[in-house]
Amino acid sequence: MVLLRIAGMALALASLNYPALLLASQDEPLILDPDVSFDPGIDFGFDEDIFIGAFEEESEKSPTAEWFEDFTIRVSQSTSGQANNHAIDLGPFGSFPKEADLETNRLQFNIRYQNAFAPGWVLQGSMWYRIYWNQDYEFVSNGDAVETEGQLNDLFIQRSSGKHSFKLGRQTVVWGETVGNSVLDIINNSEFRDFTIIDIEDARLSQAMLVWDYFDSANSSSLSTFVNLYPEFNPAPIRGSPLFFDPGFNLPDYDRDGKVLIEAGTQWKKSFEGSDIALMAAYLYENQLRYDPPLSDTPDARPDINDFFLLGFSANRAIGKVLLNFDLAFSHNILADSFAFPGTSSLSAPINLRKDQLGTSFGFEYAIDNEQNVSLGIQAQTLLDEDEGLLPGQALTNDGVFGSWLVRYSNALRNGDLNFSATLQGDLSAQSLLVFTGLDYTIDDNWSVSSQIISMSAKAGSFLTFFDEDLRLGITLTYTF
């Protein structure tokens, strides 16, 4: 500061003693002699310390604050229930009354962690923890007491180097192109507890896997191989949930009894201009357990597993705003009469045959504009030689061509702060229909609110007969930080 004051005084004195020079500088430019030079060694007396810290932040982040930057935490309170008072016609069994009732009332914490802790290394994990409040079906099943539960969604470490990428830990592997309705999307098991989850994308469960991805030098083709080190199966429905049907006995988990179960598969994918194709093969276990009735001295059913081989092909093609999808699956040695309605378990049937199955799914995605999108997916499957091995009078639960269809529409409004979505889903035999509409509103960077309406209709004999004329409403308030 002293040096600056001295410099200011010198300039003031110069202006008083040499006014003519100042006026000349204003009237015409001063032209220096071309022989004039400056000595770079001259010390003008500037104090460099005055600039230290001028552009630095006032305070550095603590190690704890930097560590928390890798976390994303979402806290949500959700409530939903069946709102329509009605009765279900069960034919010769009479009618079953259904009253409006609150089904879910819960506080959920979602925690996600992702850290690129070194070049080529990534650690990622996510989990949720729930508190079930009064009138939630988990609360009722717990003897009218608050219940808590936590679950690890995924936790893996990834190493990428050159053309190779390795991932080890709990993760999901998704095959197929048809969105939400692919016959190839059967690697990971899933859990449909209630009607708060109706999309397979939200129902998938992670498993302990090693995944190796190899990319060619042009990035036009890749080879992906997985090994499932501990195959798991669809959990039995939670007692008391809307999707629980009491069979009169317990549905336990499969007892491995020292058995080593492993799944493995590989997929080759090739990209062309505007399209992709893929070939895949895998050795898998059916995700849905099959239960035989319990023995006379035990209340527990006897779960059984079945392994099979899968061969698949998938392709897509982009034409303007339209993306066409196609999947083909051939399954060898699957259980022919396995009952696998989402959220329920396979109950024993008098027919216990293993057959080959051919399935296909196809559809399209259409981008109406930058905010609107619509997609259609149709899945159809059939058993090959379905009558072979059947005794006179026997028939399969799934005979002929069976499958489902799915239509989705989404629209982002108000610069993406307001999102509307609609889903229609039914079976190919036109026995049931589910209609879902959702509205999500982002209040600010932290707060958001969402609402859902689910309407269902089903004919007699459908797996969804018990939910005919159900109308479910739900709302969720979320805080993210």
PLM features: what roles do these ranges have?
Residues 21-102, 108-112, 199:
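N-terminal periplasmic/intermembrane-space "pro-region" immediately following the signal or transit peptide
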Residues 109-115, 154-159, 210-214, 266-270, ...:
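Residues on the lipid-exposed face of transmembrane beta-strands in outer-membrane beta-barrel proteins
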Residues 101-107, 148-153, 160, 204-208, ...:
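Residues that define the transmembrane beta-barrel architecture of outer-membrane proteins
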Residues 73-81, 125-131, 168-170, 225-229, ...:
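Transmembrane beta-barrel strands of outer-membrane/channel proteins
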Residues 284, 316-425:
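Detector for outer-membrane/organellar transmembrane beta-barrel domains
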Residues 71, 119-123, 163-166, 219-223, ...:
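Repeated loop/turn-to-beta-strand initiation elements of outer-membrane beta-barrel proteins
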Residues 453-455, 468-481:
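Outer-membrane beta-barrel "beta-signal"
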Residues 114-241, 456-458:
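Outer membrane beta-barrel
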